[in-house]
Amino acid sequence: MTSEGYPFVSYVISGRSAGSQKRRFKLYFDLNTGEDRVNVGSLGEPTEDQKKRADLIFYNCMRTRNGTIFVTNGAQTDVNVFENRPARNFYSGFGAATAEEILGDWGYEPDAPLFTPRIALVKGEGRDALFAIAARQSDDDDRTYTGQITVPVNGSEATGIATYKGLHESEAQPWRGVDLEHLNLCLVRFPIRGVDPEEIRDSTYKAIDPRYVVAAAAAVYDGRKWVFAEPKNKWDSLEEFEAGEAKKWPV
């Protein structure tokens, strides 16, 4: 909750490789639905490496529908085909299907050797938030573990769900189903504070290691609709990104 008592959601991405770093968030207004969405896209023309992983690293991460907001880390937000077969998604399928059922259609990400979990947040007009995850059972067991948990929303702290055992990308230890005796284990408490979506966005961005943070987005529910801030990106242009990369590897 914001300091004024309004629900908020935020989403942040990080990355270690140049391909993961060379991304940006963009806010779009959907003329067909009359609602906003946040897209994760390439900063400039996608590289060959990015093209190979496009379905994993480029996606709509935040969408709203009839007062409910869906936040996920992949195509499970609103895509209805996975590996050439039908798959349910949160934007059009949640309600008719549970979060676990939707993530079960997708499983964890096929990005060996990490096999990053797929995660999701669903927040409606009530005081509860739903978190869900699909993770590889273990390094030696390729079955998919799915779980979901409902968490009361309060004004004392922000709760989030992480794909990694630690908050920061540098630790690179994705959750495995065998680790999750209770789904609370992959929930994290964030020191996020603010009144408006811009303050929430900035607070979320600052919560991540500055070496790895890529972009952050946030929205606040004002009692009628979800109000989005323009996303905060580490790089505002391809030229800035390339200059930053050059500083890492001086000639």
Go through each PLM region and give its residues.
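Conserved short alpha-helical segments that host acidic/polar catalytic motifs at enzyme active sites
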Residues: M1-V251
